[in-house]
Amino acid sequence: MRNQLICLALMLCALHSASGLYFHISETERKCFIEEVPDETTVIVNYKVELYDPRSNGFMPSSPGIGMHVEVRDSDDKVILSRVYSSQGRISFTSHTPGEHVICMYSNSTAWFNGAQLRVHLDIQVGEHAIDYANVAQKEKLTELQLRIRQLLDQVQQITKEQNYQRYREERFRHTSESTNSRVLWWSLAQTVVLVCMGFWQMRHLKSFFEAKKLV
């Protein structure tokens, strides 16, 4: 029982998936991130772009002329979102296929700012953690207890999605393993057939050689 509770707690912690970071890019550079996302799961991307100021040797809020082009591809390499946003924004999308989703960002470079260095603050939230429960409570007029129950139900639903996704990955891995084993088997059989044929041909050739030399 204790082990089950520990596993459940670890899964709940994993569901609160959020990654906050910042990185530096030039205006012509493209940066991509990969997120493992179950199907029918909400993903929220918050970002803010800052422009390097050589006079102050620091970063300042970017000008209105600099925005970010955001492109999202699903596990089938299908573009599900491609759009130019402002220098600061919040992007939301829902996955419809499980697997790796690639989120790419690059600036809409202009001749005036071309080559400038940018700092991009990025926060990616996946699953139950992407839901703004304060807004949900206000909109649906939920009490604290009702809100807590809602959170628990969402967590259980997300756990189910995660379990389905893990089963999906196991099935794909098993299919890949079976396919690889089958190819190895057929390749081994092909090698065996080739070796047998070569041995038979060499024996016939040697026999013909000996007969021609009247050694047999």
From Swiss-Prot:
Residues 21-183 are lumenal. One of its GO terms (biological process) is dorsal/ventral pattern formation. One of its GO terms (cellular component) is endoplasmic reticulum membrane. Residues 204-216 are cytoplasmic. It comes from the Eukaryota. Residues 30-126 form the GOLD domain. The chain crosses the membrane at residues 184-203. Residues 1-20 form the signal peptide. Keywords: Coiled coil, Developmental protein, Endoplasmic reticulum, Membrane, Signal, Transmembrane, Transmembrane helix. The lineage of its organism: Eukaryota, Metazoa, Ecdysozoa, Arthropoda, Hexapoda. It is a single-pass type I membrane protein. InterPro entries: Emp24-like, GOLD_dom. The gene is eca. It is found in: Endoplasmic reticulum membrane. Residues 134-164 form a coiled coil. This is Transmembrane emp24 domain-containing protein eca. Pfam families: EMP24_GP25L. Eca and bai are essential, though not redundant, for dorsoventral patterning of the embryo. Specifically required during early embryogenesis for the activity of maternal tkv, while the zygotic tkv is not affected. Involved in Golgi organization. The keyword Endoplasmic reticulum applies. Its main location: endoplasmic reticulum. Belongs to the EMP24/GP25L family. A motif (Prevents secretion from ER) lies at residues 213-216.
